[in-house]
Amino acid sequence: MMRIAIYGPTKNQAHHVQAWYDSCKDADVICIADTGSTDGTKEAMLALGVQVTDVRIIPWRFDDAFNTAMYLVPDDIDVCIRLDTDERLTPGWRDKLEAAWKPETTRLRYPYIWNWNADGTPGRQWYGDRIHSRKGYRWMGATHEGLVSRLPEIHTFTDDFQIHHFPDPKSKSGDLSLLEESVREWPHDSRIKAYLGREYAYQKIWDKCAATYKEFLGMSFDTVERCQALTTLAQAEPENKLFWLKQAAYEVPTHREPLVALAQHYYEAADWKNCYDYSHRALKITKHPMDYTCTPEAWGWQPHDLLSIAAWNLRLYDECLEQAKTALEKSPDDTRLKNNLKLIEDFIAKNLRG
């Protein structure tokens, strides 16, 4: 019979403990490395029967924390699930995992819901990769740690098993120094280089963002990460915005994001024909790629809203109305979308239907 373990480090997460435990208590083993909690996290977990070990990671690195937690997992475990305390397994998860895991599987890929829209529907989501066999794996990277294997891997995909993330509201943590350290350690690792470029963008250090992403583009052929690099370069170098966005749309025809960004650019320029065309092109992409670069806006209200506005200015009023309705359906609490739809309906009733 398959034996499954939950593992991970934690610190000062007492407010999450009960819901986290309730979601994963059907595991055979739950091993947690407490890295210095002072809010009762350790005591709450021990009271629930969780195996908690005190550890200190000095200097702090995420890979050392997760590897230490993984080493606490017994050798007779078949499948390991890294589950942070702000994450939840969904009801019936064990049966779904056992059904999805094949004899040859070494890592399971599953829908990971990273955040949630205001109406409770999934926001950003992608195929997670933190469920793996017990042998041969370790975490690598001071931050944005990646799971690496010294053995050949076989990934199995499922849509039935999911992990949901419920992050605490907080400002961006300071990952920059750890990312710079990771790049110094692994200068030829394109994944870490891409994360560093993104962190420079978050902190609006645009010159370093552009330089880092350009280095990355010379290192990687990964279309997902290249798409994010190219669209971010459009922000870092506004004078080359169209070049970078069109390159992204050309290289990654599976993603809406570059096309929606182009439609938004032409909306701001009041170029309604191009805004209309790029919105249409974005909406022709109907298969969600399910990777971490996909934004809920591009796969929700935004292309419909842009198309509606462009159609209005091109006097295509029926299409304008249809797209305005769809945009509001996808973001029903948006006051501007409500006002736009009423304006369109009133105009059509007065001028075209009377």
Regions of interest found by a model, annotated:
Residues 15-18, 39-48, 92:
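Acidic helix N-cap motif at the loop->helix transition within catalytic regions
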Residues 43-72:
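Conserved donor nucleotide-binding strand/loop of the catalytic core
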Residues 7-26:
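Short, well-formed alpha-helical segments that are part of the catalytic scaffolds
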Residues 71-88:
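Short beta-strand-to-loop acidic/aromatic patch adjacent to the donor-nucleotide binding site
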Residues 23, 33-46, 57-58, 84-88:
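A conserved acidic beta->alpha catalytic loop
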Residues 63-71, 89-215, 221:
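Catalytic-site signature of metal-activated, phosphate-bearing donor transferases
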